[in-house]
Structures are given as C-alpha cells and as structure tokens.
Amino acid sequence: DFVEDGAKLAISEMIKSGTTCYADMYFFPTVSAAIAREVGVRSQIGFPVFDESSGRSADSYIHEGLKLHDSCKNQLLTKTAFAIDSLNMLDSETLSLIATYANELDLPIRIRLHENASEKSVSVNRFGSRPLERLIELGMLQPQTQLAHMIKIDDHDIQLLKNNGCHIIACPESNLKLDNGFCPIEELLLHGINVGLGTESSACNTSLDLLGGIKIVNLLTKGFSKDSSFFDGHQSLQMATLNGAKALNWQDEIGSLESGKFADFIAIDIRNIDCFPTANMASAIVYGSSGSDVSHCWVGGKALMENSELKTIRESDLVNITQKWSQKLSLARSTVKGNRNL
C-alpha cells in the first residue's frame, strides 16, 4: 500500500507540473509500473538490485525484474531498466551478470553514482579501481548506461564518460539540498556528453516539479561557467525533454514534437503574470514559469490533465491518501518516542 499510494501521489504531482515521462527506481517496481499504466503516464521503471544485506539475494532481485521486463515488452507506455542504488554495495559477479542480461536484452542500466566524495575512495579500497574504471572492466559503461548525479568527477572521469557514450542525469536540486555539490554540466556538454535533467525522489528533493528545476540548473550552469551567454533557454528546455529521452533510449518516439513520434506534450498558461514578457518564449518558460503554470498534459494524445484538473485520477483520493499516511506516520513516531522513554 505504501508504494502504491506513494506512486499515485508522485505521478499526480509530476503530471500537474508538466511531466509526461519519468524514470523510477524503487522497491516493488511491478506496483509502480501498474500505477503508471493505470494513470496513463509514460515511464521507464528501474527494477532495483541489492545485495544480501537487504534480506534477499541479488539473483532474486534480477529475476523478479526480468519478469517485469517480459510483462512490459509490448507496452507502449512502460519500459524497464536495471537499477543500481549503490555500485559499491554489489560484488563484481553480480554486476557482470547484470551486464550480460543488459546486453542480451538491450536493457538500460541506471546507476546512482558519484553522489558523494567517499565513493571513489571506497571503490578503490574495496575493489582496486575507481567507480567508472570498474564499470568499464565489467562492461557496464556503454550507450545504454544512465548515470544519475555525477557530482564528484574530474577530467579523467569526463574523458571516460565521453569515450563510452553513456548518459548523465543531473539532479541539481537534490544535490544542493543535501549539500553534496553540483554536477559539472558545462564541462560535460562541452565534451559532447548527453545530459538530461532529473529531480531525484521526494525523499531527497521534496519537489518533483521538473519545470521549476530547469531555472535552477540554468542559473547554476551559467554561474559556474562565468558566461551568461552559455546554456540558453532552448538548451535548458532540451535538457529536460529530448536529452532526457535520449538518456532513456526513447528519443525515436518521444522528447520532441515530430512526425512519427508519440503526442506527448503540455500546455503552459502564459497569461499568468509571472510568464511576462513573452517576446522570447523559451526564456519566459525557463525564467518566469513553474509547474503551477501548466494547464494541460497529454500522453500519447490522451489528456491526463485539462484546465489544471487531473482526468485519470481523482484528486480527492490523493487528499485521503495523504491524510491516511500522515496519521500512520504520526502514530509511528509517537510509538517510537514512547518506547525510547521506557
């Protein structure tokens, strides 16, 4: 119930703020996939692989995920990917198995990587190589690989990323909130590396408003580059749309409005005063608008929101869900506090 309700809340928030497709990696991926299809949003569901410290073997996670992959083969709305929360927690045998399946089935591999300063030293001490070097050794750094965060990287790392054609998902709001640093987007783009934009989870970021995050990544990138002309509004919007589709290996079907692609698009109410002036529309959207300005959302030509009203899920149900879990969590906190006082 927790994952099902959380998925409903998160998907609703994303639709309300203009997201038509998202990538996910969490427990019970079959539940998340079912909710996404029920609501009608497009998704790439990552099935997580953990080590035995989670109470289950890595093999069981892999085979459960492959069952989900098989069930989604003919789904237009849902794709799947391997998802690795911590590279340092998995042994090389497990990672090699993931690489083998990924190559055989043409499955993407999504990895949270270089999210903090200790990852490199832990990898070197435990496995004898840096994280990216280890991925290369195991055949996991390839054009199907999605690396989220990548904030603690140097010139050597950037060259490895370029040489192997993988994709970066920058999550600046989460990184800043947790005081972890900032992905060197300018350097990555200058080296021709594809960078998409993400929000991270509500646990790390609180907000899933990707449109609002575009402004933050734009201003930070300009600030670090010390060049106000670098990374303009159009480039910023592309990072949140087509670049993201490329990272998911979905660019032939989504990411831009073109003949032959799915009709996934949104409408932004530019009559709102925060969007003025509109002489440069890309600039108005990036610097003046936020997710609250989105009025309509379509996925595959189907309306998921019209005039700011969700069409495939009842907002009254969402209110009930939040109230239910608020009460449960409050009770749990009170119980824990009471036990500590015994």
PLM regions: where:
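Alpha-helical scaffold segments that flank or form the walls of functional sites
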Residues: D1-G40, H63-N74, Q323-S334
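Histidine/acidic-residue-rich catalytic or RNA/ligand-binding cores of hydrolases
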Residues: A117-S129, D155-K162, D179-L188, N205-K222
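Active-site glycine- and acidic-residue-rich loops that bind
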Residues: A23-Y26, A81-L97, L176-L178, A247-N249
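Metal-coordinating catalytic core of metallo-dependent amide/deamination hydrolases
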Residues: V31-I151, H156
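Glycine-enriched alpha-helix->loop->beta-strand junction motifs that scaffold or abut catalytic
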Residues: V39-S43, Y101-P108, M140-P143, L160-I169, ...
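His/Asp/Glu-enriched, well-ordered alpha-helical/loop segment
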Residues: E137-Q144, E186-N272, G288-S289
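Divalent metal-coordination and catalytic microenvironments
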Residues: G18, A36, F82, R112, ...
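Active-site microenvironment of metallo-dependent hydrolases
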Residues: A240-L342
